[in-house]
A protein has these predicted regions:
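Short, highly charged low-complexity linear segments
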Residues: 185-187, 212-213
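Thr-Gly-centered strand-to-loop micro-motif
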Residues: 157-159
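Active-site-adjacent substrate-binding region
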Residues: 154
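Extended, intrinsically disordered, low-complexity segments
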Residues: 195-239
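Alpha/beta enzyme core
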Residues: 7-23, 27, 32-151, 165-176, ...
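Membrane helical hairpin/interfacial module
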Residues: 1-2
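Intrinsically disordered, low-complexity regions
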Residues: 6-7, 200
Length: 239
C-alpha cells in the first residue's frame, strides 16, 4: 500500500488473473494492515482478504480494534485475519537473545480473543520470527497444538521462510493452515540480480532480461514452498 498505493497493484493482479488465468482461484490479500484506515482502503479498492496486525499494541487495544475491524469486514463479506502474540522482526531484536516467553501466543488468551473479536483466522507466535531473525531453537509445537485444540479455526504462520521440510510438516500436523512467505522470495530475487550484474563485463542494459531471470528465481522458490506445504495441484478442490 505504501509503495504502489494499493489500487495499481490490485488492478494489475486482477487483470492478469481474469484475462490469462481465469481457471485459477486467486485471493488478493492485505498483509499486516496496521490500522483501520489501511484495512478500510484495501477493502474499498477490492481486496477480498485482509489482515489487521495489532500484535504490537496492548492486548486490550488489540482486541478492541480487531473487533471493530472484524465487524466492518463481515458487513462486507470479507474475512479478517488477526494476530496475537509477537512474531519479532530482525530490526526489532537484532542478534540479541530473545526471552521467548514474552512473545508467545497464550492459548487461553487466544480463545478469548477469537471469541470476543469474531475473526476468521489467527496468526500465531510459537517461536517463529520475521526477516531471518534468530528463532527459537524449535517451535513450541505443544503450544501450537493447544491453540489449535481450543480454536479449531484457520491458523496462520508468519516468519517461516527459512523452515526446512521437517519443521513445516510438523507445524501443519499441529494445526497450521497457511504459511506467509516473503523474505525467501526477496532473497531469490536480489540474489539473481546480483549474479547477472556483478562481475559481468558484458552485462546487458535491458532491464527486462535481468528482471525476467529474477522472476524465474522467485517462481522456483514458490513452487518448492508449495510442494513443501502440500499446496500443489489443488486448484480443482478449491475452485
Amino acid at each position: 500500500m505504501d509503495y504502489a498505493g494499493g489500487r495499481a497493484i490490485y488492478g494489475l493482479i486482477k487483470n492478469l488473473v481474469e484475462n490469462y488465468y481465469p481457471q485459477i482461484p486467486v485471493g488478493i490479500h492485505l498483509d499486516h494492515g496496521k490500522d483501520f484506515e489501511v484495512v478500510q482502503r484495501a477493502i474499498e479498492i477490492g481486496f477480498n482478504s485482509v489482515m489487521y496486525d495489532g500484535s504490537r499494541k496492548k492486548y486490550s487495544d488489540n482486541l478492541m480494534t480487531t473487533k471493530k475491524i472484524a465487524q466492518f469486514c463481515h458487513e462486507r463479506g470479507i474475512n479478517l485475519q488477526g494476530e496475537l502474540g509477537n512474531v519479532p522482526y530482525l530490526k526489532e531484536v537484532g542478534s540479541t537473545e530473545i526471552n521467548w516467553d514474552d512473545y508467545m501466543t497464550d492459548p487461553a488468551q487466544a480463545e478469548e480473543f477469537v471469541r470476543e473479536t469474531g475473526i476468521d483466522a489467527l496468526a500465531v507466535a510459537v517461536g517463529n520470527a520475521h526477516d531471518f531473525a534468530k528463532e527459537r531453537p524449535e517451535p513450541d509445537y505443544e503450544r501450537l497444538g493447544e491453540i489449535n485444540r481450543r480454536l479449531n479455526m484457520p491458523l496462520i504462520m508468519h516468519g517461516a521462510s527459512d523452515w526446512e521440510t521437517e519443521k513445516t510438516v510438523e507445524a501443519v500436523r499441529r494445526g497450521i493452515n497457511c504459511f506467509n512467505v516473503d523474505i525467501a522470495s526477496r532473497v531469490a530475487f536480489i540474489t539473481s540480480l546480483g549474479k547477472t550484474i556483478d562481475g559481468n563485463k558484458s552485462v546487458s542494459f535491458d532491464v527486462r532480461e535481468h528482471l525476467g531471470l529474477a522472476r524465474d528465481a522467485v517462481t522456483e522458490v514458490v513452487k518448492k514452498k508449495m510442494d513443501m506445504f502440500g499446496s500443489s495441484g489443488k486448484i480443482e478442490s478449491v475452485a
